[in-house]
Amino acid sequence: MYRNDVKEISMEQTKIILDENEMPKKWYNVLADLPSPIDPPLDPRTWQPISPDALEPIFPKALIMQEMSSDRYIDIPEEVLDVYRLWRPSPLFRAHQLEKVLKSPAKIYYKYEGVSPAGSHKTNTSIAQAYYNMKEGTERLTTETGAGQWGSALSLACNYFDLECKVYMVRSSFYQKPYRKSLITLWGGNVVPSPSPDTEFGRKILQEQPDTPGSLGIAISEAVEDAIAHENTKYSLGSVLNHVVLHQTVIGAECKQQLAQVEEYPDVVIGCCGGGSNLGGIGLEFIKDRLEGKHSARVVAVEPSACPSLTKGEYRYDFGDTAEMTPLLKMYTLGHKHVPPAIHAGGLRYHGDSPIISKLCSEGLMEAVSYDQQEVFDAAVQFARTEGIVPAPESSHAIRCAIDEALAAKQTGEEKTILFNLSGHGHFDMSSYDKYFSGELM
């Protein structure tokens, strides 16, 4: 079906690669450029803005400073860059074959973060967080994970910096994605299903709801409880917080350089959104241009209709976890007691969102859409059969939106440029694809 256009396609660049020495050396902090400050996190004991000292039991000082920093750029430590060089800069692809099948005048580009050792964008922050913890004498990290991308990324990072790693993996994904468990174990991590018998809160949930699928909110509570209870242990979070979003901005910085090589700038930038880190990673560099009046690219968050915090949640203060142990964050939320259905995009089953992403959406600087699981997998299969890469279910939400943007351009004849973040591969999600092909998706 491609024969007639082979010559034309071969003359256009498909893969845009940066040299290692072109890798960004700084993270971009959008807090420096927002028209007004984001609302501060609140201490759950007083409901007053939380002090840095109150966060020290669970986070290292360097990450607390980054969380509250208003500096526009923060230097990436050389030790972190050394590990980044294993896979960064990551490639930017032009989706020629998908464009051909869609017969759209739109140009579609995707940034592929699945080339990292753990197979997703999560390694961009896990390496940084493990490094800063190691520097301050932390010996052990605890964390939650949804589909397992974050848990495996942190396990890898802890292995590099000689830290122990305890992962509380949301129960539904623990059984849906067994090879993510294997990967966590391979890199030296200890992974258990959440809720678990290893914490007081986990035991409470299991007693009250023995058949619960679990949630990221529950897993966060367990990981925080564990960190507080053990010496030389800190908690590590894979999304939501400012410093996590900060570390992901290498994605967008590379995209801008790569698109400049082919004299392109996106009209729309798309990322799936659970906690918001991969969306912020690809989108905030373009938000910066918009705030400076240079360009006006739309930035679109794509979430599952089964967990639609941005599209149907309330913008208010809420806890980041189910047990009410974390600071209160101003964000779009479905409520911290919310337990979403056990969809296959386990990494997007979070009740809230990044305060940065939430503020940008509330002020109209970002927009949000949601899709159901069936139409997301339809897009994933179409992408795999054209571009050859098997996408993670989470990343496939961005693909669905990109395809719809291209089809809309087909209707209007608009020659728009679409950029989306393919945040991870789906090699450990094949059982989910099996469910799709057998008609057994929820």
From Swiss-Prot:
SUBUNIT field: Tetramer of two alpha and two beta chains.
Pathway: Amino-acid biosynthesis; L-tryptophan biosynthesis; L-tryptophan from chorismate: step 5/5
Keyword Lyase set for record: yes
NCBIfam families: PRK12391.1, trpB_rel
Record-level Gene Ontology MF annotations: L-serine hydro-lyase (adding indole, L-tryptophan-forming) activity; pyridoxal phosphate binding; tryptophan synthase activity
UniProt keywords, alphabetically: Amino-acid biosynthesis, Aromatic amino acid biosynthesis, Lyase, Pyridoxal phosphate, Tryptophan biosynthesis
Source organism of the structure: Methanosarcina acetivorans (strain ATCC 35395 / DSM 2834 / JCM 12185 / C2A)
Statement: the UniProt record of this protein carries the keyword Lyase: yes
PANTHER family, per database record: TRYPTOPHAN SYNTHASE, TRYPTOPHAN SYNTHASE-RELATED
GO BP annotation list: L-tryptophan biosynthetic process
PROSITE patterns: TRP_SYNTHASE_BETA
Annotated function: The beta subunit is responsible for the synthesis of L-tryptophan from indole and L-serine.
EC number annotated for this UniProt entry: 4.2.1.20
Cofactor(s) required for function per UniProt: pyridoxal 5'-phosphate
UniProt name for this protein: Tryptophan synthase beta chain 2
Enzymatic reactions: (1S,2R)-1-C-(indol-3-yl)glycerol 3-phosphate + L-serine = D-glyceraldehyde 3-phosphate + L-tryptophan + H2O
PTM annotation (N6-(pyridoxal phosphate)lysine): residues: K122
Matches recorded under InterPro entries: Trp_synth_b-like (IPR006316), Trp_synth_b_CS (IPR006653), Trp_synth_beta (IPR006654), Trp_synth_beta/beta-like (IPR023026), TrpB-like_PALP (IPR001926), TrpB-like_PALP_sf (IPR036052)
Family: Belongs to the TrpB family.
One Pfam family named in its UniProt record: PALP
